[in-house]
Structure formats: structure tokens, C-alpha cells
């Protein structure tokens, strides 16, 4: 990969420019970063991975402004029905189990190996999400289908606070 060549994935920036201007500094929104990007695996394939003991997975369910997380594996009846709103399934390391997702990860090989972990794939019903949280690492978010509102917090104090109600954090919206 020529790290000095501009990439549509990075809004026309080269990997060198991206790493200097944005990596660990500020977010970059790139609409249509991958032309005609579609889901690389079906919902059923994702659910099958979530049922495996060899794959890290978790569900996040929202009930009355409270978020509950459960770790997988998830058998056929251990996830809510897809018709139920307010829940999400997260499956870690999908690139190790699906060749198409592995190929997707190769587009990010400009990131040093020590900072490039894996591909997590999620499925969410309407109203589903992961709840207020912060990541202690940099994240590339690719949305293959559906609609989602993404927010990036301006919060500087990252101390966890027990009992804080959902929606009180000051966030700037990125859609």
C-alpha cells in the first residue's frame, strides 16, 4: 500500500495525512467511504457466529432507560426476537471467521499492526445501541445498512459515574 496515495476511504487524504491530522486527534466523517458498501455477511451468519464458543459476543438490551449487557455464546432462543426493539448484538473478531470481512480489514493496513485489532460486527433493532460509553481506542465505524444516529461526546472527564441517566451527557451529533 502506498501510504502517500490519496484514498476515498479517508475522504481523499493519504494514509500519511490521515495519521498526522486525525488519528488520535479528531474525528473524520466520510460519507460513502466504500462505494456501494453492503453487509458482508447475513444476519443469520452473524447470529451463527454469536452462538459459537470460539467467538466473543455480547448483547445489549435497553429496558426503561437501563442498559443490560450479556456475554455470549447465544443459543437459538437466548437472544430477543428481531421484532423486539431496543437491543443490539455485537460480535468480535469477525475477520477471523469470514473471508470477506478479513478482506475489508486489509483496507486499513496503513494503521500500525500494534493499533489494528479486529472487526466487530453489530446487528441492532430500532432503538438498539450500546448505551453511553467511551472507547479507549480509535474506531473506524462503517455502516452497511439501516439508519443510525452517531454522537461524539465532547466530555473530557472519562471517569465512570454509577447511576447517571441515559441522555444527560453533552454530545455533538455526527450523522
What are these regions (language model features)?
Residues 1-21, 35-172:
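Active-site region of the double-stranded beta-helix
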Amino acid at each position: 500500500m502506498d501510504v502517500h496515495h490519496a484514498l476515498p476511504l479517508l475522504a481523499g487524504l493519504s494514509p500519511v495525512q490521515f495519521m498526522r491530522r486525525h488519528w488520535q486527534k479528531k474525528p473524520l466523517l466520510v460519507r460513502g467511504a466504500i462505494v456501494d458498501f453492503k453487509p458482508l455477511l447475513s444476519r443469520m451468519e452473524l447470529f451463527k457466529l454469536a452462538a459459537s464458543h470460539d467467538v466473543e459476543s455480547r448483547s445489549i438490551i435497553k429496558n426503561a432507560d437501563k442498559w443490560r449487557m450479556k456475554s455470549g455464546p447465544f443459543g437459538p432462543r437466548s437472544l430477543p426476537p428481531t421484532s423486539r426493539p431496543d437491543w443490539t448484538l455485537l460480535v468480535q473478531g469477525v475477520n477471523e471467521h469470514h473471508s470477506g470481512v478479513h478482506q475489508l480489514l486489509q483496507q486499513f493496513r496503513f494503521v500500525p499492526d500494534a493499533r489494528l485489532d479486529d472487526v466487530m460486527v453489530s446487528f441492532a433493532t430500532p432503538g438498539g445501541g450500546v448505551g453511553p460509553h467511551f472507547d479507549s481506542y480509535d474506531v473506524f465505524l462503517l455502516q452497511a445498512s439501516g439508519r443510525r444516529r452517531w454522537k461524539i461526546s465532547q466530555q473530557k472527564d472519562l471517569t465512570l459515574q454509577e447511576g447517571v441517566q441515559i441522555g444527560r451527557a453533552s454530545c455533538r451529533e455526527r450523522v
